[in-house]
Amino acid sequence: MTSLGARPRLTERALPEGAPLLALGVGLALALSAGLAVGLGADGPPLGVSLAGGVGALTVLALALARYDLAVALGFLVLGIVRIEPAPVDGVFAIVMAVALVTGRFDLRSAPLWASVLVGLFLALNLLACMEAVDPSRAASFLSITAYLSLLGLWTSGYVRTHRRARMVLKLWIGTAALTAAASTLALYVDFPGSIELHERYVDRAQGLFNDPNVYGPFLVPAAILVLHELLEPRLLRGGRLLKLLALTVLVLGVTTSYSRAAWLNLGVAVLVMLAVLPLRRGGVRRASALLLTLVACFAAAGVAVVATGSSKFLEERANVQSYDTQRFGAQRGGVELAEEHPLGVGPGQFELLEPISAHSTFVRALAEEGVVGLAVLVALLLATLGVAVRNVMLGRSTAGLSSTALLAAWCGLLANSFFVDTLHWRHLWILAGLIWAGSMLPPGGMSQASSSTGVRSPT
C-alpha cells in the first residue's frame, strides 16, 4: 500500500524516544479503566470476576507486547460477544491501542485530519453535555465507551495498511460472523449446551452473543457483503468458492432469523448499492448478473430453511408494522422535545433515564444528548465518511485489497440502519469507518497493490 506522506516509516517493533507517548498510553488506559469503574458502580463486580478480568488483562497485555498482531486477532475473534458494556472486545482493543500508543504504532496521521477533528469535536460536545446529566456516573461510563470506539476507528485506519493484515481481519470477521450465525440459527431449532444463550431474549429470534437481535442481525451484514464481493472477485481470499458460498448463505440465513427489520433494511440497501456500482466498471454487468444469481440462490436457500422449520408465518408477522412501533416513534418525538429544552443536550447515556424506551435512532440520541450542534457534528462525520467511500470507489482506491465497493455498500447499509436503531456504540461501525478512512489516504488516482496486480480497474 502506498506510504503516507514523506515521514519516516515506523517498523513494527520501533519504540519512540522519550516519555510523552508512554504517558499518553497510560492515560488512555487509566481513562478507560475509570469509565469502567464508574459504570460498574460502587459495589463493583464479584471478586472472582475481578480476578479473572485482571488475569485476562495481564495476559492480553503480555500478548500485545510480544505478538502485537496476535492480540489484534484475539480482538476480532471476540468481536461478536457484546452482552455488556464494556465488552470483552473492548478490553482487548483498549489494551492493544494503549500498547500501540506506547510503541509508536498508533499514528493519528494515518487517518484523514478532518476525521480526527470531527471525532475530537464530538467528544468535546459530549463532555460539555455532561453538565446537564441527571446521572453523572452513567454519563461518564457512556462517554468513555464513545471515546474508546472513536479511537478504535482512528486506530483501525492505521493498522490495516498491508495485505497480510487486511487478509487476517477479513478472515476473522467473516469467520466469526459465520460461526455465530450458524450456531445462533441452529439454536432456534435444536437444543444443545448453551443454545438458550443464543436466543435468550426472544424465543423465536436469534440474537447470538449480543443483547438484542437488532444488533446481532446487522453485525452479520458487513461480513456478508465482504464475502459476497470476494466470491465475485477474489482478492484476499483465494480459492474456496464453495466455502465462500456456504459462508454467505449462512450469513444471509442469520440475518433472516434475527427477524430484525432494520437488519433486513441494512442488507437490502447494501446489496442495492453493490448492484448500482458494479455496472459502472468494465465487466461490471457480468459481475452484477453473477451477484443477482448468487443472491437468488442464497435467499432461496434461506427461504427453504424458514419454510422447512415452520417459521414462515412468523417471518410474515415480523415483516409487518408492530404494535410497539408507536412507542418507538413516541420516544423519538420525546428526544426532539428534550433537545428543545436542553440546547446543549441532556448528556451522554441519559436518554433512557428521561424517556420510557431507547431512542431507536442514532440521530435522535445525538440530538437529545449532545444538542443540535452535537447532531450536526456527528452527521458531518458520517456523511463525510460516506463521501470518502464514494470517492474511493470512483478513484479506484482499496484498503490493502479490501474492496472499496464492498465498504461503500456496507457503510450505506449501516447509515440506513442508524435511522431506526442506535448504532453509536456498534464496534463494527467504527471499524468499518476506519477501513474507509484508510483507503482515502492513498494518493489521487492511486490503487492498492492488490488492485493493480490483478488487473482491477476503477472503481473497485
Predicted segments with their positions:
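Loop-to-helix entry and N-terminal half of a specific, functionally important transmembrane alpha helix
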Residues: A247-T249, V390-F420, I436, S440
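Membrane-embedded alpha-helical segments of multi-pass membrane proteins
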Residues: L47-A57, E85-R105, L143-L152, Y216-A224, ...
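A juxtamembrane structural motif centered on a specific transmembrane helix
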Residues: T2-V26, L30, L395-A400, A433-T460
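Alpha-helical transmembrane segments of multi-pass inner-membrane proteins
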Residues: A29-S33, G56-L61, M97, G120-L128, ...
